Amino acid sequence: MKKVIKRLLVLLALVITSVGLIACNEKPTPQPEPIVETEQFTVTFDTLGGSEIPSVKVDKDSKLTKPANPTKAGHEFSFWFLEEEFEFDFQTPITSNITLKASWTVNEYTVTFDSQGGPEIAPVVVLFNGVVTQPETPHKPGSGFNFWAKEDGTEFDFASPITDNLTLTANWIELTPEQQIEEDYQAVLASFVVSDMELNVPTYGPIHGSRIVWNMNSPYISNSGVVLPLLEGTDPTVVSVSATFRSGTTRVKREFNVQLKAAQPVVLTNSRAVEFTNLTTEYDILPGTLDLWFEEGGTVPYVNPENFLRLIEGFVDPEMLSIMQFTYEAGILTIYYPYFVEEENHTYELTTVIDSVNQTITTRDPGFYWAYAYSTETNYGRNIEYMDETYPGYSYESPETGLVYDLGKYNLQIVDKAGEILLPFSLVNQLFAGSSYYNVFYNGDKLVGIYALPDEGSDEYNAMMDTSLRGTQFSPDLVVNNFNTLAFFMDHFYGLKEYYGIATFYDLLFEKSSIFLSTEPKIFDGALGQLLHKSIDELHTSYGYPSYYNEVGYAGQVITKINDFGPKVGGWYQNSLWPVEDAISSKWGSTAARPNYWFLNTEKTHGVITLDSFRTRDLYESITFDNTIVQYIMNTQETLVPAATGTKFFFYNTGDQENDQVEVIIKGAAETYFNDYKALLEAAGYTYVFQASGARPVGYFTKNIGGIDYMVVANYDAEFEVFYIGIADHLPETYSIEWPVNATNVSGLINGDSAVYLEFTLDKMTAESPALTHVTLDITYNTGGNIGALYRVVGFITSEPFRTTSITADTGSKSSSYIKIVNVPNYGPLKWSLLVSGVSFSAGNSMATIFNENNLGPILGIRTGGGTSSITPILLPNGTAFTMSSNSMNGIRSGSGTELDPYVYTNNEAGITPDYQLGVDALYDEASILAILNGHIWP
């Protein structure tokens, strides 16, 4: 049936065609349509080493069908691209022949190292067909490394390409002790020299842990591995350092050669602005910053002296600083200023020259280093007048050479950095500030301004020790600088160097250079304590406190027994101090029970005053209640309190850096004066605050003046028969806590200043015995104190100017000048004598010297203990602090000053021999003392 239908359809088509042809027979024959061929483009695929992808043809403006991803060993296909890093978009019409390239990501494989008990080695990622770098040879105690093995145990070839993840296993062989030592030795040798100033000297082998004992064989090399550059005049040389390696019972000695060289020039590359805060009330100095310079990787700071002086304006008199001239020329800094002395009507031209070419600091007049210093806030010089050079008997002798500090001898370098002159900070501080007791302390993080050496536990001390360097080691450059600085300071600022026959302190330092050159802070501090207490061994030189590099809580060199001292200081305790204490205890029961004064006879014509130290307080004296003194101390223009009645007034400045306060002791006021002064205060607007709790006999007064709540305490002290007024610029938080000013403190104020103490003691003695004619000043238990306090005490003994003789050790200058004490009460024509012992030291020794030199009266007792020098504080670069005998020495002048009988100046370090000897058992025996005084021929 289907075939029939198909044939019928074909027949029908033929019929229709025929009819059409007949109907159109009269029209032109039609032209055929032109055949249009479609334009095509070829897309070629370059797999760049991958599996082949055949090219394809694509019609113009058509889109390419993305082929299947090619494959390539060790790679992952990423995409096709025409241009690097830009993936081809297969939705883009094709308009030309193109070649698409395959982008591949190389496979990564991990190579893992199994060290089999050796050090852990991090896995390494390697690209396909890459090679893995052989790691450093691992080490394992007791074993020697053989090779890295594949899984089959054979040695891996590190030139082999990596085509899969891989684990390599260390193959070890057991070593003999000798072999272990050899490997340790080779490892030490490879890293032995770190720098010109540092060697790597481990105490255990870095591979097998062999015990290593070093013998440096040179004072220039420490057990810490610090190498000291050779001092000037020493030829370069090679020294052999030996190390004994021990493994079990096996010992092997090896030698290491070390080149000792001269110091290399300091190259300063890094600067840092360091914050500065002044923490002493003695000088008013603003906070600031100071640029410090360092070598690359170094910790020793360098500073421009001009910047340093400008930083501490306030210690440096602003008027002096304004006229100082700083001249920089050809590697030389010259600092100049004129200094006018009104008493002499003379101007001194003061100059110092800092020469980086010759490495010297030259000062013709050493006064350069102190003449610019501002007066301290504390009134240490009250009632002291210095006679000028025209006073009869005045003398001064000095070499014309001045001072030359040759820093080259100590490898302390002056650096010329692009015309700026820089010196080690510790040296600048000591020269330009420390010699006047002001110090700028650098602790690695900040700068702190302090006076002398603050007490441990004080705010100043805590600020000094607050540093990020706590518990760390010294750097080698700091160790070297510290060693040389210590030698320089001791050679130039220790006043008794010549007295004790010390040519240079390098001799002492080199005896124990290994510990002085240690990088361990505790070791250095122990060595310094030994040097000061055992080698130098004199009372004015002692350890202060440890470096800020030490761990918190470390107190440094602590004296716990008499053998911690050398024979001189130990002998002073055993032969002087303790026997005198025994004699005092035998007489009065204890040293604390010793009276302020006592009489030698029943008639009380001969008395003894006890003076165990020379103390001073910051105070002002007046015969009237001077409110300007109150205003000055309280830093105000306001009149704070009404004037009080009395015959003499002592104004004590007892404030601190945060608070102002003044305490006034008034002689000549009646016991009933409290009610009178209370009425004056209340009339002035003060409110009286009193709680009848029985804890305090009186309350306090308060008033707000200028926004400040002032506190005033007033009371009469019956023991000393004085009236007390205390003024503070703040109130106590509660009534029951400690008050800032306290009427019960009268005894402490009076006894805290030797001149005030002596005045009140004489008041009591003369009141008790109007027949008093002879006074013996007992300084047998006096170990020194403030020189100004000593001078004021002498003012009670003589109203005439008295002579003091000084010797300056570093310059060789010698002088005798005269001092007069004013505003001293008149107690009539008393005859004075002095009682001394071996305990009478320092200022006590100076009192005996002044007595002797000025013929103030007979000296009784035992030869004094010496102590010719004043004390100077020293801060080392590493922060360790100590005090020592300075260049300023007390002495005696003999001779008449003529050509035939010239003046001879002798320091009194050996002490003063008394005119009349007393054994220690007779020091406090009334009959023995009285017999001497009665037998003495008085002028």
Language-model region placement:
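C-terminal motif of bacterial Sec signal peptides marking the signal peptidase cleavage site
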Residues: G20-A23
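Compositionally biased P/S/T/G-rich terminal and signal peptide-adjacent segments
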Residues: P265-I285, S398, I623-E663
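C-terminal "post-core" interaction segments
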Residues: D455-Q473, V480-F483, A487, D729-G748, ...
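Secondary-structure capping and domain/repeat boundary segments
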Residues: P32-F192, M197, V239-A263
